[in-house]
């Protein structure tokens, strides 16, 4: 329930944030803000798919574990030690990855943003501050992913709901106080504070053995995790070219104003997709439990019911959002100039609806602790990056949006559906009736 509340809040807060950005930020500063966010998304290149691996592997171990009244992990000792081994491995990995992210993205982003023809905008200190906060938030990610895999979804999403509210309020206050680009630092910083409070207060006893026990035997990274992770690493890295490439391309070739329009549009579209995906993402631990029990019939019923709701939500939301953008342009509202026009907006949101199909299918298959999307990720990422770059650099937002929809229609949905049908048939041959 709180997962849905959280996504509803995001959908509710997004228009308010957009209005305040339009009111308090110049169009050029808006472009810098959304380009900041797109560059921060380069985290996917250092995360190497570990967050998905953590959730999937933890859910399989949690099938034999539970929390006692004091919040400690109890149950099968072998499963407990394997879970602790997994946690210790990923906590160390993310500590190093966070440091690499801060150094490389901080410096690389500085060089990229320095090419802007808007020298009067004060962006350097906010940028480096944002990178540091994002690096800390990135280090916290495996702790949250582990909790999700251990079926603590209700508590996590309750805190994410609170986190979303607090983060939005911080952004709004920063805008009201005319701190400009510091809004990005304020929003992410409050999110980091909420995450740390959850881990250090609510789950202190849960995480205690991860720092006091060193299992002699446990998860074998090379034999168990790496066969799945290296595929996720490639696919996750290339996902940047599917999710976050649009604003930087338009920033580089067409300037910060067009990039700002693209960023605001993508924020609305992403909020809708995130809301719709809540009906599937929160069920992933349950998928893992049913798969471990080989109860595939119940798995399919559970999946189709929730993915159907997800597709219904995103389809209805897409129509409503497009009508909103059309109305703003029809009545010549000033906010219309801060977003893409109805044609490219419609192309982007149509592609997002199609992309929801692949998101649901991917969640289903990855719950099997396998990663069959290597070829898909390579083809989808490269084709989208090349097509969007080629069309976007030449024809602006219309070219980028047309390329996005074209790749979703002709590459992503057909290829992902083929993989889903093939793997589902192969992996469920040993169903327990």
Q: Predicted segment positions?
A:
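Helix-loop junctions and terminal segments of transmembrane helices
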Residues: 48-77, 269, 273-294, 367
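Membrane-interface junctions at transmembrane-helix termini in multi-pass inner-membrane proteins
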Residues: 135-160, 346, 350-377
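Hydrophobic alpha-helical transmembrane segments
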Residues: 128, 157-207, 383, 397-421
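Transmembrane helix-bundle signature of multi-pass secondary active exporters and lipid flippases
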Residues: 36-48, 235, 239, 243-245, ...
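Interfacial transmembrane-helix starts/ends
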Residues: 34, 70-96, 225-229, 295-312, ...
